[in-house]
Amino acid sequence: MKLAIVIPTYRKRNGEYKYQIAKTLESVSNQTHTDYKVFLIGDLYDDNDEFEELSRIIDPSKIWSHNLPIAYERSKYSGKELWVTGGVYASNIGIDQALKEGFDYICHLDHDDLWKPNHLELISTAIDETKTNFISTRSGKGWPVMESTEYLTKWRPLPSKVFKSTTCLNYKHFNIRFRNMIEEVNIVYASDADLWHRVNQLMVKNNEWGYVINESTMARLDSQFVIKNN
């Protein structure tokens, strides 16, 4: 199973994200499932040499990297408005490039999150077994909250109940992208929550189900590079 991984990123002025991003990319390079390609998009990462240095953490045959010339959302918004829109444009650039290169299934990974080495292997195996178009593992905090103890549980994504870095979607099937909710809908609402809502609607309409793998394979780094929720 070929899997694309979309990672939007930017550089904080104090430079602290460099080490978080490095850890994130190292967690990808350590995956037991190796049939993947990373699409790393800099949202005007303002130190291009550093951006290229980070890109080299991944095998050159397994990465497409592009540093955008403009910080799209960060040039327009701040505070909550930036929090709900940040990375939308960069993510969609990565999704479009992955589709152009023939990938159907695209996994998301934020630049301050980590995957356990078996994350992609579990994702790939579950897709092969279920033929689902949406798959998620559990996060370290237990999301999504589920009562089922089965290893694979039928489920449809819900806003605020999904960690983006646990998900993998068939974007060719859903034909969907992140929306800038402020510009496109005139609502200050998180773009990823909006995406899960629209995926849910499509799945209900088509009478299809996604699945959750009942295993935690994702963790988040805090500003001191300590895992917060493994």
Q: Locations of the language-model features?
A:
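Short, acidic, metal-binding catalytic loop of nucleotide-sugar glycosyltransferases
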Residues: K23-D35
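Short beta-strand/loop segment that forms part of the nucleotide-sugar
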Residues: Y36-Y45, H66-P69
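Active-site-proximal specificity loops/subdomain of glycosyltransferases
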Residues: E50-L99
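Acidic donor-diphosphate engagement hotspot in glycosyltransferases and nucleotidyltransferases
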Residues: G102, W115-L122
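Short beta-strand-to-loop acidic/aromatic patch adjacent to the donor-nucleotide binding site
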Residues: F103-D112
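Conserved donor NDP-sugar-binding/catalytic core segment of glycosyltransferases
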Residues: E121-T149
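Active-site donor/metal-binding and catalytic loop motifs
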Residues: G140-S148, T167, G210-N230
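Acidic donor-binding loop at a coil-to-helix junction in glycosyltransferase catalytic cores
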Residues: I187-L195
